[in-house]
Every structure is written in structure tokens, then in C-alpha cells.
Amino acid sequence: MNNIHNHKILILDFGSQYTQLIARRVREIGVYCELWAWDVSEADIREFNPTGIILSGGPESTTEENSPRAPEYVFNAGVPVLGICYGMQTMAMQLGGLTETSTHREFGYASVNLKAADALFAQLNDDVTSSQPKLDVWMSHGDKVTRLPDHFQVTAMTSTCPIAAMSDERRRFYGVQFHPEVTHTKSGLELLTNFVVKICGCERNWTPENIIEDAVARLKAQVGDDEVILGLSGGVDSSVTALLLHRAIGKNLHCVFVDNGLLRLNEAEQVMEMFGDKFGLNIIHVKAEDRFLDALKGIDEPEAKRKMIGKVFVDVFDDESKKLTSVKWLAQGTIYPDVIESAASKTGKAHVIKSHHNVGGLPDYMKLGLVEPLRELFKDEVRKIGLALGLPAEMLNRHPFPGPGLGVRVLGEIKKEYCDLVRLADAIFMEELHASGWYYKVSQAFTVFLPVKSVGVMGDGRKYDWVVSLRAVETIDFMTAHWAHLPYDLLGKISNRIINEVNGISRVVYDVSGKPPATIEWE
């Protein structure tokens, strides 16, 4: 079996919004990597034993006295180092060079001229018509390197940035002022491949097939003949977790599927058919709609609704786990961004951005060991593994659905009537997006129930019924988003179908808010 962790890249995070993109690109190349805080200890770096190190960009200025610095050991570890943007600047400063605040800041597209051929830029050229090789890149910096450290050479420049890239080939230290990790940099992936594969010498063992083989072997070693319980939601993460565990331990996996009354139309039936009938998983189907809706009566504040939904889920899950007296392990679909965001890194420096629905939250007295087979994986990697395990592409590529489900898509107090209405309206919305070819053109689309009534006309009579809002957005990273410009005739068709086919809805509106200032979900 290939050792998928034998060659690995350490990425030190200086706070760039693009840092996770670096990790995803390295994984895409086929090499394992981890993302750690910039002030990681020498002992941790030695223990990780990286094949190469990448220093990310960041919002700070190297000209400030207390700005972040890479650990000195990074430059004494004997492995190649690539500094990106701020990473290049701190490399230059720490090795004896000089940086200054630029009078001309560069943000956006730029063309860099390659001055010297080094291993990083080998075979790269975005302008074959020019006598001098050029790259189309994405810049985002206010400082610049003005004096090179000893033994470095300038390898690229722009009209306003004389040192756009530098290298010390003897020590295998490289710096680029632009961002190769973003798709706007045309040959960015090729540049990173040059660093990771050619300079660091990493083998490309990080593939879906190898990851599955490694995960199954590790699960067998961790769990043995013990029994495992998993909350199966039908979402991508829990589904892939279930199939990996099923491959490793078979019937010793007990999946608990909780129908809380807040799911999409026919979702419970689809989950049972897919995982019970097709894959043969051992599934406990808990019909708990009344229990959830009773607990949510009178609660209209979004965070209070989330917490109550989470509490009732834990109670239901706990009730089921007590019936399984032989269970020793709890499986969760925690993925790598959850680990990064939830203060679970080795350095303890990461700060909690939000509480994730599947990180923690179960009673301490359950005394179960934790199994998290996806905790090293990004979402796109989980999807690729799901595909390799036999999950259908349409399920893996379905738009995101929040953990609390319709609980945050029914504004205000949650009632069964409201859930039923928004469920039917949303099914029509999705059906028409699929039929028109727009479903995969947008990043996320859904329907929101508004707890207000509006007058309408049906035949010769007037009716006073509820309002729903359609929401569709386009985004790359879900950090920012644009509202999707769906064709008017498509919106008109969806609106007419909802009003005519869903008894109780008299008006359909379309949300044209971007993020920021609005969030993608309404609650």
C-alpha cells in the first residue's frame, strides 16, 4: 500500500484569505499537506517532518515591528521553502534583505516578466508571442522587497515591482510576490507543481483510491471488532463517512437517521433507499418530527432555534445509542476546514469562527471514542472519494443544505404548515433549475418561508396567503457571493408554478442581495 503521508508539505498560515486555497492546490497536485499557524514550534515542525514548506500571504506589513515571522528553524530545516506574497517578504527580511511600503500598491491582474530561468519557473510562459517569457498573475500587496538577501537573484519583475520573484537555488529558497494559488494566476498550478514535485521531490500518492485504501486500513486498526454509531444525515460528509466505515467494519456500523421534519421533500425516503437498499447499511430510522416541532414551539430567534434543534438531536441520538449497548465509538463527518476553524490545530492558535453542527456537542457521559475518517480532507476531496465509493454525482454535487435544515429557512417560529409549504415550493424551484440547466450554474439555491401574508387573486376570488422568497447565488468560496441573474422567464415560470400548485402561497419574491452585505442564508 502506498504511504500517502510519506511526502508532505507544511503550509504556515500568516492570515491570507487564500491560505486554504494553497492547501487545496497542493492536494490537487497529489501531495498531502497540512496548514499550521505561523508561530508553530520547532519541535512540531521536526515531528511533522515536512518534505517542503510554503509560507502563505497575510494582511500584516513586514515593516511593522511586531509583524509575524516564520520560525527560524524553517530556514535551517534543509528542505525547500516557497514564500508567497507576505511569505516572500518575511523570508527576505529574515534572511538579511529589506522590505518597504510601496508607493504603488498592486491589487489585481499583472503581467510579470521572467528574468532568470530557475526551477520554479521551468517551462512556464503565458505569452508565446513575446521574446521574453511572461506570466499573467494575481497581485495583492502593499509592501515590496527592495533589497535581496545574500545569494538570492531576481527571477521576475513587473513595471512597478522590480523584485516580483526571487530565488536562492543552492538552498532551494523561492519567493513570489503574486498568488499562484488563485485561478486568476494562469500558470499558478504549474508553478506549484514545479515546487512540490520537481523541487521538493514529492511523489503524487494523494489520490482518491489511495486515500480510501489508507482510511479503511486505519479504521480497521482503530476500531477493530468494536461497534460504531454514526448520525447519518444524507449529506455529503456523513454519507462518505458511512461508506468508508461500512467498507472497513461492515455490520458493526450502526447509522442513526433522524427525520426531524425539517428535511427536503422526500429526503428521508431517498436516504433509506440509497443507503439501506442500495449499499446495505444498517440504518435505524427515527421518525422524530413531532418531538422537534413540539420543542421549537414559541421560539423565533435564529440562534435559539439552532440550539434547540441541536439539543433535541442530541437527545434523540442519545436515546438510540442507549439501545445499542455494545457501541464503543462515535463516528463524525468532521472535515479539514472544521478542524482549522474549530481550534483543533496542534498549535492551539486557530480561533473558533462558528460552532459546527458536527464538532462536539454530545454528552460527556456517552464515553465513546471518536472516529473521524474525513478530518484530513477538504470538501472537494470528500466528493471525489464519494464518487469513487459509488455515490451518484448528482447527490455529491447537490447544493449545500444547513444542518438545522428548514429550521433556518422558515423565518421566525417553526410550524409544520410552514415547513410543508416551503418544502413543496423549494421542490418546484429545484425541479425548474434542473430542467432549465441552471442548477449547476449557480452555487446554491433555496426557498425561504416569510411569516407574512399577502393578498392575491385566484379566479374571481381574493386570497390572503403566505409569501416565499427564492434565493440563488454564485460564489467561488462562499465568503462572498453575487445574486444569480436568473432569466426573467424562468423566474416567472417558477413563480406561477408555486402559486398555482402550492395551496397556501400567494406571492413569490426573488432575493437580489449580495454577500456582503447580506449573508447567503436568511437566518
From Swiss-Prot:
Q: Which GO terms describe its molecular function?
A: ATP binding; GMP synthase activity
Q: Does the keyword Nucleotide-binding apply?
A: yes
Residue stretches making up the Glutamine amidotransferase type-1 domain: 8-205
Q: Could you name the active-site residues?
A: 85, 179, 181
Provide the Gene Ontology terms for cellular component: cytosol
Classification via PANTHER family: GMP SYNTHASE [GLUTAMINE-HYDROLYZING], GMP SYNTHASE-RELATED
What species is this protein from? Pasteurella multocida (strain Pm70)
Q: Which residues bind ATP?
A: 233-239
Q: Name one Pfam family in it.
A: GATase
Q: Which residues form the GMPS ATP-PPase domain?
A: 206-398
Q: What is its EC number?
A: 6.3.5.2
Q: Which UniProt keywords apply?
A: ATP-binding, Glutamine amidotransferase, GMP biosynthesis, Ligase, Nucleotide-binding, Purine biosynthesis
Which reaction does this enzyme catalyse, per its entry?
Answer: XMP + L-glutamine + ATP + H2O = GMP + L-glutamate + AMP + diphosphate + 2 H(+)
- Cite the record's note on assembly: Homodimer.
InterPro entries given in the database record: Class_I_gatase-like (IPR029062), GATASE (IPR017926), GMP_synth_C (IPR001674), GMP_synth_GATase (IPR004739), GMP_synthase (IPR022955), GMPS_ATP_PPase_dom (IPR025777), NAD/GMP_synthase (IPR022310), Rossmann-like_a/b/a_fold (IPR014729)
Q: Lineage of the native species? A: Bacteria, Pseudomonadati, Pseudomonadota, Gammaproteobacteria, Pasteurellales
Q: What's this protein's function?
A: Catalyzes the synthesis of GMP from XMP.
Under the heading SUPFAM superfamilies, the entry gives: Adenine nucleotide alpha hydrolases-like (SSF52402), Class I glutamine amidotransferase-like (SSF52317), GMP synthetase C-terminal dimerisation domain (SSF54810)
The protein's name in its UniProt record? GMP synthase [glutamine-hydrolyzing]
What pathway does this protein act in?
Purine metabolism; GMP biosynthesis; GMP from XMP (L-Gln route): step 1/1
